[in-house]
């Protein structure tokens, strides 16, 4: 169990580090976000949920469509697949040359998020939003600019 929790913690740290790569200073309010992957522990097993386009990278993953919108300190996550909506709030906890960090609360659960440009091996960049919340590591990418 400790090994799985360690792996989940490492994944969360890696997601935050990845999101801090690249240039630009995107903010959570600048985009409409789409979920790429979610990782969490069930029992002693690390479980992935993923967007349909990620199914080849995570063939064991349950396919889920989820979006996130943030504006004026309010955050809404819509789970299109399961017809659920989660609401909460966010505040800026810090800014750096690469992006912005946030404290977030969704449905009474507190966590952390960071928005920055991620640079990939081919040189392409995209705004990314990793979130760590109540044992879940969620990874969103910018679907469209507002």
Regions found by a protein language model. Name each.
Residues 2-23:
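Sec-dependent N-terminal signal peptides of Gram-positive bacterial secreted proteins and lipoproteins
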């Amino acid at each position: 169990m400790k090994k799985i929790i360690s792996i989940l913690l490492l994944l969360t740290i890696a997601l935050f580090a990845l999101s801090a790569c690249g240039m630009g200073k995107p903010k959570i309010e600048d985009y409409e976000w789409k979920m790429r992957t979610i990782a969490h522990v069930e029992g002693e097993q690390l479980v992935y949920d993923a967007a349909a386009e990620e199914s080849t990278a995570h063939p064991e993953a349950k396919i889920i469509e989820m979006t996130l919108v943030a504006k004026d300190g309010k955050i809404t996550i819509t789970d299109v697949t399961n017809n659920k909506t989660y609401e909460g709030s966010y505040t800026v906890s810090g800014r750096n040359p690469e992006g912005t960090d946030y404290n977030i609360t969704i449905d009474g659960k507190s966590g952390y998020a960071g928005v920055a440009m991620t640079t990939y091996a081919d040189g392409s960049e995209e705004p990314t939003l990793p979130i760590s919340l109540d044992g879940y590591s969620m990874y969103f990418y910018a679907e469209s600019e507002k």
